[in-house]
Amino acid sequence: MEKKVGTDRVKRGMAQMQKGGVIMDVVNAEQAKIAEDAGAVAVMALERVPSDIRAAGGVARMADPRIVEEVMNAVSIPVMAKARIGHITEARVLEAMGVDYIDESEVLTPADDEFHLLKSDFTVPFVCGCRDIGEALRRIGEGAAMLRTKGEPGTGNIVEAVRHMRQVNGQIRQIVGMTDDELMVAAKNFGAPYELVKEIKSLGKLPVVNFAAGGVATPSDAALMMELGADGVFVGSGIFKSDNPAKFASAIVQATTYYTDYELIGKLSKELGSPMKGIEMSRLNPEDRMQDRSV
């Protein structure tokens, strides 16, 4: 019997439907409803948000399926869930449950420190993180339908997401400006599939959407990432670690949509209460940097 898989075109098309929107981390049905009411285009069902994963330490695994099911039953928007890098069984379980997307995520403790999942073998579309064009194209080559910056999850610090978005977009501009005979060397230097490097030169952009993630903590952070070329925004710990999650979630959505309306963003940012405290990058030990968990 032939194995059933989704085509790249279908998977990428599904991801394109989320373009311009906000995807929010939630840990229960109540939070999922708040996210949906605020205008989120999708939710990420988790057992713990990244800041709590970071604080707790230990091994972080796929969420309890009960939590994922509760979220799926509570909302009408797409539901995503995270699987550990390289953990075939976690991903297959989530696919069997009927989640709309799987995030092969460095936020969870990697199950395989050498190989990512061959995402083209699955029917469900995958989301993956990247810091540069090499990581981006390797994940697309494996079958990812959506990318996101890795940033530094659970810190409330936008600096790494900014770095990663600028890096990817700068390298895209380099590729677009290359002659055809330079592309093979570029593919080798980036550690990226040659055919995908050629596709970027032809399209002038990535063949999949690239969202901002990892450190988005305020409406201004979300708007900044859209200004820098993000196709949308993931918000992890920022919303439900704030003083007023419903108001904060709505402000993030509006700031993402109207990211050049600075007067509106200023109004949205008033009286939101305190955002999550955040962590300065220099205070993180190297072993605590989630973004370094995969290449």
Curated annotation (Swiss-Prot):
E.C. code: 4.3.3.6
GO MF, one example: pyridoxal 5'-phosphate synthase (glutamine hydrolysing) activity
Alphabetical UniProt keywords: Lyase, Pyridoxal phosphate, Schiff base
UniProt keyword Amino-acid biosynthesis, yes or no: no
Sequence positions that bind D-glyceraldehyde 3-phosphate: 166
Binding site for D-ribose 5-phosphate: 25, 154, 215, 236-237
Enzyme class, UniProt record, top EC level: lyase
Record's keyword annotation contains Signal: no
Domain of life, source organism: Bacteria
Catalytic reaction list: aldehydo-D-ribose 5-phosphate + D-glyceraldehyde 3-phosphate + L-glutamine = pyridoxal 5'-phosphate + L-glutamate + phosphate + 3 H2O + H(+)
CDD domains, sorted: pdxS
GO BP terms in the entry: amino acid metabolic process; pyridoxal phosphate biosynthetic process; pyridoxine biosynthetic process
Pathway(s) of this molecule: Cofactor biosynthesis; pyridoxal 5'-phosphate biosynthesis
Membrane-crossing residue ranges in chain numbering: none
Active site as annotated: 82 (schiff-base intermediate with d-ribose 5-phosphate)
Pfam families (UniProt xref): SOR_SNZ
Function: Catalyzes the formation of pyridoxal 5'-phosphate from ribose 5-phosphate (RBP), glyceraldehyde 3-phosphate (G3P) and ammonia. The ammonia is provided by the PdxT subunit. Can also use ribulose 5-phosphate and dihydroxyacetone phosphate as substrates, resulting from enzyme-catalyzed isomerization of RBP and G3P, respectively.
Subunit structure: In the presence of PdxT, forms a dodecamer of heterodimers.
Protein family (similarity comment): Belongs to the PdxS/SNZ family.
PANTHER family for the chain: PYRIDOXAL 5'-PHOSPHATE SYNTHASE SUBUNIT SNZ1-RELATED
Name of the featured protein: Pyridoxal 5'-phosphate synthase subunit PdxS
Organism: Listeria welshimeri serovar 6b (strain ATCC 35897 / DSM 20650 / CCUG 15529 / CIP 8149 / NCTC 11857 / SLCC 5334 / V8)
